[in-house]
Curated annotation (Swiss-Prot):
Keywords: Calcium, Hydrolase, Metal-binding, Secreted, Signal. InterPro entries: Alkaline_phosphatase_core_sf (IPR017850), Sulfatase (IPR050738), Sulfatase_N (IPR000917). Its cofactor is Ca(2+). This is Sulfatase. Ca(2+) binds at D43, D44, C88, D350, N351.
């Protein structure tokens, strides 16, 4: 057992020991009390990119620092088996609809298109034509929470919907600060575009892409540094920023803090969705944090890039500001106005880390793939008095599609009728309340990709299955050559050993057959598109019932 795993085991044991004490000592929430809900989503943050041991079974970074998110993990429950789609746009579509990409209101399988094979490669399968946005008849998570009396807000990356008024007109967003990370402006008569930093436009002055963020676009000055960044510094020198353009991540933090201050006085609860653009490429952190990491020696061979480390901590500092605002909304030092005790905070990432800037080891590969490095991410839920602090669920798998029904149950909102919009996700509210460690009827996850994405993805379908003995398995099916891969994730986190590769046992074959039939049934039920063969324009068939028998030798 590694030192990281020993440390993680102690954390789990501590959580088990204190759980009964917490159950008896904490004041139970009123069953009718509606919490505020804050959902924070990082962009491209990998499973091992936090320094907390809770979120990654002890494999957290020894170079990157995330003390504020680590504090959130200590105050809440982390999930070891938390999953997403393979990249950002389909994850965001799944989040807001509660549906896999096969859902009637969804249809978003990839960023941009499924026709993204590497240049010059002739593919045997002609990809499916996907949707690029959620359908306008989609009843979004925002709309459902509004029916329970929630004020809704969106701060950050938009993806999966059309930007602008449509977020308000058919997605149910009351306060809209959704935007790109790029800002276009005319500076000294020249049209320019940059990422992450405010621009000083000749006509508009300091600005980001949308007007709702303009009040927070001014350069860093002494007053801001003293009031905002000095109290949260962590070995960095924020005064290096004086007079430089504002970073988008800080500006979004400013907007969220202002929103919390305003809503803390309201009678109705709020739902704030905060999908930060950090830590997506281009890797452009604040220079004070980059200076810190350039001077710091990495003790983690997986993680050595100073600018990426700085970007992770910039994200972390902004999360810390959000958490601090919940404890002291008006920022006067008196926490009597705090709303943290009645606010659920969730931290999540939209997909696995992008290898190059970071490394997802021990997980296999990266964003864009269905191996664990592409779809397994940190996940934390905090809700004082309901969720046991410093706890880790190492059994229940959770997917993006589960957030919608989970938050609806917590908010006391009714889901859309299945005749209007069928939910693929299932609520894990009972698991959060520790009425059980798992939902017995929630032990399968599916992914389906009817197209191409450079070298990372090809037409395939995948099932994650939790066996009755709580062992987690994952089966891949590739349409081009009708091949399978099977991994035991509980024993082989890095997906290094394909159990079907060499002389599989009868027990292994039986399991693969069972998982294949579950996958096949799901594909048929959802009428999942598969594309057509280029050679004859015929529809690519689903995996055959007994296809895994070819591995019998």
């Amino acid at each position: 057992m590694t030192s990281e795993m020993k440390k993680f085991s102690k954390i789990v044991l501590f959580g088990l020991l204190i759980s009964p004490l917490l159950a008896s000592s904490q004041t139970k929430k009123d069953a009718n009390q509606k919490p505020n809900i804050i959902l924070i989503m990082a962009d491209d943050l990998g499973w091992t990119d936090l320094s907390s041991p809770n979120t990654s079974l002890g494999y957290g970074s020894k170079y990157y620092e995330s003390p504020n998110i680590d504090r959130l993990a200590q105050q809440g429950k982390s999930f070891a088996y938390a999953y997403t789609q393979q990249n950002c746009q389909p994850t965001r579509a799944a989040l807001l609809s509660g549906q896999y990409a096969t859902g009637a209101q969804n249809g978003v399988y990839n960023v941009g298109s499924l026709k993204r094979a590497s240049k010059g490669v002739v593919t045997p399968i002609m990809p499916h034509n996907q949707n690029n946005y959620l359908q306008e008849d989609c009843v979004s998570m925002f709309e459902t929470l509004k029916t329970a009396g929630y004020h809704t807000a969106w701060f950050g990356k938009f993806h999966a919907i059309k930007l602008g008024k449509q977020a308000e007109s058919y997605m149910g967003v009351d306060y809209n600060v959704a935007l790109h990370k790029e800002t276009s402006a005319t500076v000294n008569g020249v049209k320019v575009k940059n990422e992450f930093f405010a621009q000083n436009d000749d006509a508009k002055g300091w600005m980001f892409e949308i007007d709702n963020l303009k009040p927070y676009a001014q350069p860093y000055d002494a007053a801001y540094l003293q009031k905002v960044l000095e109290p949260i510094k962590n070995g960095n020198n924020p005064w290096l920023l004086e007079g430089t353009p504002k970073h988008l991540t800080d500006a979004l933090g400013d907007a969220v803090v202002g929103y919390i201050k305003d809503r803390s006085k309201a009678d109705s609860p709020f739902f704030a969705y905060i999908p930060f653009h950090a830590v997506h490429v281009s890797i452009l952190p604040r220079l004070d944090l980059e200076a810190k990491y350039k001077a710091k020696k990495s003790l983690d061979p997986r993680h050595t890039q100073a600018d990426y480390a700085a970007f992770v901590e910039l994200l972390d500092q902004t999360v810390g500001r959000v958490l601090n605002a919940l404890e002291d909304p008006n920022g006067d030092g008196n926490k009597a106005d705090g709303i943290a005790e009645n606010t659920m905070v969730i931290f999540y990432s939209d997909n696995g880390g992008f290898m190059g800037p970071t490394n997802n080891s021990p997980l296999r590969l990266r964003k864009g793939t269905y191996y664990e490095g592409g779809v397994r991410v940190p996940l934390i839920f905090k809700y004082p008095g309901v969720i046991t602090p410093n706890s880790v669920n190492t059994t229940q798998e959770v997917h993006t599609i589960d957030f919608y029904p989970t938050l609806a149950e917590i908010a006391g909102a009714k889901l859309p009728s299945p005749k209007v919009q069928e939910m693929d996700g299932k609520s894990i509210a009972s698991v959060l309340r520790e009425e059980s460690q798992v939902r017995d009827d929630k032990n399968e996850l599916f992914w389906h990709f009817p197209g191409y994405m450079d070298v990372r993805n090809m037409p395939q379908s995948v099932i994650h299955y939790r066996h009755s003995d709580n062992q987690h398995y994952k089966l891949f099916y590739r349409y081009e050559d009708e091949s399978f891969e099977l991994y035991n994730l509980s024993n082989d986190l890095g997906e290094t050993t394909n159990l079907l590769a060499e002389n599989p046992s009868q027990q292994t074959l039986d399991l693969a057959l069972k998982m294949n039939n579950k996958l096949r049934a799901w594909l048929i039920k959802n009428n999942a598109p598969t594309g057509i063969w280029a050679k004859n324009c015929e529809k690519v068939p689903y995996p055959k019932k007994d296809a895994v028998k070819k591995y019998i030798k």
